[in-house]
Amino acid sequence: MDSLDEEQIGALQKAFDSFDTDSKGFITPETVGVILRMMGVKISEKNLQEVIAETDEDGSGELEFEEFVELAAKFLIEEDEEALKTELREAFRVYDKEGNGYITTDVLKEILRELDNRLTEEDLDSIIEEVDEDGSGTLDFNEFMEMMNG
């Protein structure tokens, strides 16, 4: 549960409670699929069954709230990472004006200045030196992603 924020856990609790109509403290695997689809998660029935089997620690065939949160977290975190990658790809594309698959280190300096205007020229040079390992003066998308993800 550490990987989700309070708001996400609260939303999951509401969904869980609204489907646990008898207040038994668990929901069925079918219900899990319904909730995930309502949250916009696309998952095949086969994958859903596999994930439920992995998550159903006590083997009851039903999911208690903690098990449900653990299962849902896998999808919510994956979705966030995918969204971030899409945003970074779009940012890279905007700065890759010629569409040749790379940006120059000068363009990277511009991006870094926009992200943090407190960076000195020395800071920028140090960052560039670290990310442009081959000294080519350019960064392709993978190098850019590596830098942005730390």
From Swiss-Prot:
Keywords: Acetylation, Calcium, Metal-binding, Muscle protein, Repeat. GO terms for cellular component: myosin II complex. CDD domains: EFh (cd00051). The modification N-acetylmethionine is found at residue 1. Pfam families: EF-hand_7 (PF13499). Ca(2+) 1 binds at residues 56, 58, 60, 62, 67. SUPFAM superfamilies: EF-hand (SSF47473). Residues 7-42, 43-78, 83-118, 119-150 form the EF-hand domain. Gene3D superfamilies: EF-hand (1.10.238.10). One of its GO terms (molecular function) is calcium ion binding. Ca(2+) 2 binds at residues 132, 134, 136, 138, 143. Troponin is the central regulatory protein of striated muscle contraction. Tn consists of three components: Tn-I which is the inhibitor of actomyosin ATPase, Tn-T which contains the binding site for tropomyosin and Tn-C. The binding of calcium to Tn-C abolishes the inhibitory action of Tn on actin filaments. There are three different troponin C in lobster. Belongs to the troponin C family. This is Troponin C, isoform 2A. It comes from Homarus americanus. The lineage of its organism: Eukaryota, Metazoa, Ecdysozoa, Arthropoda, Crustacea.
